[in-house]
């Protein structure tokens, strides 16, 4: 097989037996003991399968993860069905409408659509149902921005919809910040208790 993050629970129906949730917990525990890190401010970020994994971390390792950033990733429907984090979780997510690996509309009974993921997190976090919106064109690419705000503990769910965007880490500029900067600027506002 190929290397990947196992973003599903280890069960008889999961083709992977890698215990990546346990590995991540052990890694965080080791880093917390050996380095001076703030255990209330641990964030996860990923692309593609890594983004799928950080969504799952927000569900299954929520005792450690304060906020996540996901690029071109989706949640398994099974993950949504079993997702019960210990606290409201701030989410920033980027996805292209022409993504052929993680389709924007999901894959029936396998990957949830971006809309279903947003509905899950906005419902769980009790955010506004009507997002703040904006749109810009960056180098000929239309970017639609949706911010679901006023969630429990100050959480937000932010979605950057890249119209005709592919399965990539987006090289975009939104209000002077690139994708990596947007993620850091967002997640760093949070700790395990919510908005700092």
PLM regions: where:
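Conserved beta-strand scaffold positions in the cores of enzyme catalytic domains, especially
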Residues: 145, 159-161
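Serine-hydrolase catalytic machinery in alpha/beta-hydrolase-like enzymes
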Residues: 1-43, 53-56, 60, 82, ...
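The feature captures the conserved acid-bearing segment of alpha/beta-hydrolase catalytic domains
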Residues: 66-153
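Catalytic active-site module of serine/aspartate enzymes centered on a nucleophile-bearing elbow/loop
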Residues: 175-196
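Active-site loop->helix "elbow" adjoining a glycine-rich segment at hydrolase catalytic centers
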Residues: 48-51
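Short beta-strand immediately N-terminal to the catalytic nucleophile in serine-hydrolase-like folds
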Residues: 44-46, 71
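Sec-exported extracytoplasmic/periplasmic mature domains
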Residues: 29-36, 58-66, 119-126, 188-192
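Histidine-bearing beta->alpha loop at or near hydrolase active sites
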Residues: 164-168
């Amino acid at each position: 097989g190929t290397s990947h993050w196992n973003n599903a629970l280890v069960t008889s129906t999961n083709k992977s037996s890698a215990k990546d949730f346990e590995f991540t917990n052990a890694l965080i525990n080791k880093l917390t003991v050996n380095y001076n890190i703030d255990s209330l401010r641990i964030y996860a970020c990923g692309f593609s399968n890594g983004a799928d994994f950080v969504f799952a971390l927000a569900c299954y390792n929520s005792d450690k993860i304060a906020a996540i950033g996901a690029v071109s990733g989706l949640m398994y429907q099974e993950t949504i069905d079993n997702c019960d984090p210990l606290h409201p979780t701030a989410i920033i997510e980027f996805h292209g409408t022409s993504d052929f690996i993680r389709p924007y509309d999901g894959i029936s009974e396998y990957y949830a659509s971006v809309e279903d993921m947003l509905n899950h997190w906005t419902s769980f976090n009790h955010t506004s149902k009507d997002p703040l919106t904006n749109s810009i064109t960056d180098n000929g690419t239309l970017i639609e921005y949706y911010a679901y705000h006023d969630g429990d503990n100050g959480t937000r769910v932010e979605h950057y919809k890249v119209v005709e965007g592919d399965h990539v880490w987006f090289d975009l500029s939104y209000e002077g910040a690139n994708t990596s900067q947007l993620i850091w600027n967002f997640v760093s506002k949070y700790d395990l208790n919510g908005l700092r």
